[in-house]
Amino acid sequence: MNRLTSLLIALVLVITASPALAQASPTLSALEIELWPEYDKPSVLVIFRGTVAPNVPLPATLSFEIPSKFTPLAVAYRDPQGLLYDLKYTTTAGANATAITFSAPTASFQFEYYDTTLDTTTPSRKFNFAWRTPYPIQALNVVVQQPVNASNLVTTPKTESSIGVDGLTYFKQSRSNVNANESITLDVAYIKSDSILTASTVKPPAA
């Protein structure tokens, strides 16, 4: 009887442990965070585009924090053909951050929000991006899109600049093998004397 009881206990432990193993913290193979100041609003459009690692079971339940003073604009997943589809999500408010939680049916996901603290009343404009990684990330890029008619864009830490296919200038910070709970910060400053939004000047891609 003691032997049978021991076997039953062992079986129960294995069964109850399995879900916990399945829910272990996932790894992201790639995450790109795009910061687009004055794109289609006098704010900073913040876009997260990520991909979970191949060994992460799908659907993958993910949770990301954004500052509590902002609200999610959209959450989506990307299908194998590259098309985006809206995704249901929940939010949990904290003292300083709001957690966005969703279940991604495919490896690729995207969510967006606006940083509405950008002051565009003076030519000297600046904003700060600060975020803490919830998961390990194999390849992380933070990309700033320079607004149309802006000049003297400076980032801290320094970034590499390049011209995109849309003719705009982009500044990129790249990191690899980022651990969970690491702090990611980027200060951005630039000069812009008008209120023209970038979206009103960028031509849509050719069909």
Regions found by a protein language model. Give the residues of each.
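N-terminal secretory signal peptides that target proteins for export/translocation
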Residues: 1-2
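Lumenal/extracellular ectodomains and adaptor appendage modules
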Residues: 19-207
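Bacterial N-terminal signal peptides
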Residues: 6-16
